[in-house]
Structure formats: structure tokens, C-alpha cells
């Protein structure tokens, strides 16, 4: 997790860093013939790059606001299931740094109708690539399952989207807080581990939502409470703040009734603020 964060910060620094001034050569070492000037090519706007990606897909939206994207690929009898929530570390209020990532961990430790480890039933049916991640702008959860086990994956994802809080306990919060803090210690003590913080502070001004790293501070993690978990879930984990992506051995005609069956009863949450 921390390695992914470090790679992302490094890439962000390359994108945002101003162009370096051209190196100058002392007159005594200058060549007698001047080199031909080079014209730098401006990068294409992100909107153009996104538009150039042509991946056939269908999409629809449930009445509760859940957006669904379906891409059909029949090469193998598997379906990749991915849920993207439009919330990340940029949404953390002052004094709550690291909470988006801490909450991601809690999502794997039981929901109201499956109060057990999220991974256990997936492993029993041969799922692969089951994991999650947190970044500035989003938190995502994903797994690839046999087509015959798609119902199970949708049930598990929908239960933690709509029915999580009844399974959250102080003991679970304390356990995952410890796990996240150990991740932080491991990252901080790795070579150049503290460089991440300096890079973000150098790139973004005080008060910018990207200025603090996703792992958060020890003090803020220690202060996280079950009440904070409830507030974060209610504010950010409604279906209207998420996108469900199904890719593989499935089509939109099959997906619509399945998604409605499992996600249709999840109530919409408030409309979160958007940073532009």
C-alpha cells in the first residue's frame, strides 16, 4: 500500500514540477558551434487522452444514484468486480488525516449480513485479485470471480455499501488502527520514507486538500472513534457517490437485474462536496 503511495507521489511531482531552466556552459568550455535549438512538445490535454481510449461499454444508473459500467469480454468465464467511491484523503477534515485509508481497512472486517472476513467466501470460490486502495480522490475495492460466483461478489459488495455500521465494533476499529499504524511505521522507516511528506508539502500550499499524505498522522489515527466511522460512512459511502464496474463474462442485459437485486435497497446518501 505505502509503495503504491510513494510511486503515485513521485509521478505527481513529475507532472506538477515546473520546467527546469536550461543548463548553461561556462564560456571557456563552450563549443565553437551552437547546438540547434530544440522545441519541446506540449503534452496533450487529459481530456484528449481520455477521449482517445475506445473501450466498448454500456452504462446505467439505479434510482438510488449508483452508476454502473459494464464491459463484455468473453475470453474467460470470469468477471472483474470493482466499486469506486468518490472519496479519499482530500475529503478528510482537519484532525482526521488517515481516516479514509483506515476506513478502507474496516470495510474488509464484516457487514451486517456477513459479519466475518470479506476475503473468506471469495477465497472459497476461487476469486483472485481481491484488494482495495485509497488515494487523494477515491477509494476502491475489487476482486475477480468466476462467472458462477458473481452473485456472491455482488452480495458482499452491496452489503458493505448499504449495511456496514451494525457490524462495526470498537474492537475492530482498534485492531485496524494498529494495522494502519504499523503500515505507517514501516513506510516511514523505509529508505526515503519521509520524503513523501516533504514532496507533498513542497508541491501544495498550506490548506490544500492534497498537502497531507493518505496514511495520516499517528495522533489523528489514535483519535479516530467509532462515531467517526459512522459519520464517514453516512457522508461518503452512499450509492450516489459510487461507481460499480463489471468487466468480463457479462453483458448489460444480465447485469441490470442482478445489480438492482443486490444494490437497489441501499439508500442514497447526501451529495458530497466536490473539489474543483
Where are the predicted features?
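Structural beta-strand/beta-sheet cores of well-ordered domains, especially the beta-sheet scaffolds
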Residues: 5, 58, 79-81, 104, ...
